[in-house]
From Swiss-Prot:
Protein name (Swiss-Prot/TrEMBL): Altered inheritance of mitochondria protein 18, mitochondrial
Interval spanned by the transit peptide: 1-30
A GO MF label: intramolecular lyase activity
InterPro entries found in the cross-reference section: Chalcone_isomerase, Chalcone_isomerase_3-sand, Chalcone_isomerase_bundle_sf, Chalcone_isomerase_sf
Pfam families membership: Chalcone_2
Subcellular location(s) of the protein: Mitochondrion
Family as reported in the entry's similarity comment: Belongs to the AIM18/AIM46 family.
Annotated organism of origin: Candida glabrata (strain ATCC 2001 / BCRC 20586 / JCM 3761 / NBRC 0622 / NRRL Y-65 / CBS 138)
UniProt KW keywords: Mitochondrion, Transit peptide
Record gene name: AIM18
Cellular component terms (Gene Ontology): mitochondrial inner membrane
Length: 309
């Protein structure tokens, strides 16, 4: 008891509690709770966890942080372990596993966490169409982009300057907006680490779109797109952990939704949003700005994009 009190005092007064220590503590507490017979108390705890994960999907309620996971590494070059609670993300996705229009290669992956308890909500992967990779260089190598936003340091290579620009909150907005305007195709893959709610998953996507800095300038147009999102995501009820929710940004700017039920091994094609601002704003929130959905995912994507110029 005394040792515990002393340790708490040291942590409080000297700031020795590192983020890694807090992460370990939370993880151990969650993993130590073995399955027990259902009781009113345990049911309330379960629903509290589901609600917390759903709140993270909704976005904006909590400040989200990223911890670069030691677990995150390639397995035989075919998949990336984002978190040990979910199936590793394949580095290449295509048919027949998912109902996609073409073959996609991973740009980056990471975790969305709730900073209040450093609580992991879901794993996120961003993919780029293999056929569209040359568009990255076409956009970032243009004279206009190079002269005005990218190649500011003559002592650095073009690729290094691209990475610096993509790390800048303001410049990254400009670079990614221009990239998305090139009709580039991408996929966002969301995999819950804990059981989540379909309703709040949908609300989270909508909120991320609405948080784009240009959303207020296009309220009427965006409102029509938001209505399409509500109609397109047809799943209801819980979204079990380790299921996959995919959003494919097509060349015409439309956004196609699909859902993979891992337990049943069934893929459901959902609806499509045709208003291009929805897909553009959503992927811009993943890849740019000062408060991206998952900072770690954004950073990895920036590194990969810089390597393509």
């Amino acid at each position: 008891m005394l040792r515990t009190l002393v340790r708490r005092s040291l942590i409080k007064n000297t700031g020795l509690a590192t983020r890694a220590t807090r992460l370990s503590a939370v993880t151990k507490r969650l993993q130590s709770s073995a399955p027990k017979p259902a009781t009113e108390k345990s049911d309330k705890k379960a629903w509290w966890i589901v609600g917390l994960v759903s709140a993270a999907f909704a976005g904006g309620t909590y400040v989200c942080t990223w911890e670069r996971e030691e677990l995150q590494k390639e397995r035989d070059g075919k998949s990336v372990l984002v978190d040990d609670a979910v199936t590793p993300f394949p580095v290449v996705i295509s048919r027949p596993t998912y109902p996609l229009s073409t073959k996609y290669d991973i740009l980056g992956s990471g975790i969305r966490s709730v900073s209040v308890l450093t609580f992991k909500a879901y794993a996120l992967g961003i993919y780029i169409a293999r056929q569209d990779k040359p568009k990255v260089a076409q956009v970032f190598d243009s004279t206009f982009m190079s002269k005005n936003f990218i190649d500011m340091d003559e002592n650095k290579s073009h690729a290094e300057n691209v990475k610096i620009a993509l790390d800048d909150p303001e410049k990254s907005r400009i670079l990614i907006d221009n990239l998305l305007d090139s009709n580039i195709r991408m996929v966002a893959k969301l995999t819950p680490i804990k059981n989540a709610s379909a309703k709040l998953l949908k609300e989270g996507i909508i909120k991320n779109v609405q948080m784009h800095p240009d959303a207020s300038k296009n309220k009427e147009t965006l409102a029509m797109g938001i209505k399409e999102v509500e109609e397109a995501i047809k799943i209801k009820g819980p979204v079990p952990k380790d299921d996959d929710f995919l959003m494919e940004l097509l060349a015409d700017g439309s956004l196609k939704f699909s859902y993979y039920n891992r337990r049943k091994d069934i893929v459901n094609e959902l609806g499509t949003v045709h208003q291009p601002l929805v897909g553009k704003y959503l992927f811009a929130q993943y890849l740019s700005g000062s408060n991206p959905v998952s900072p770690g995912t954004k950073d990895q994507c920036a590194e990969t994009l810089a390597s393509l110029v």
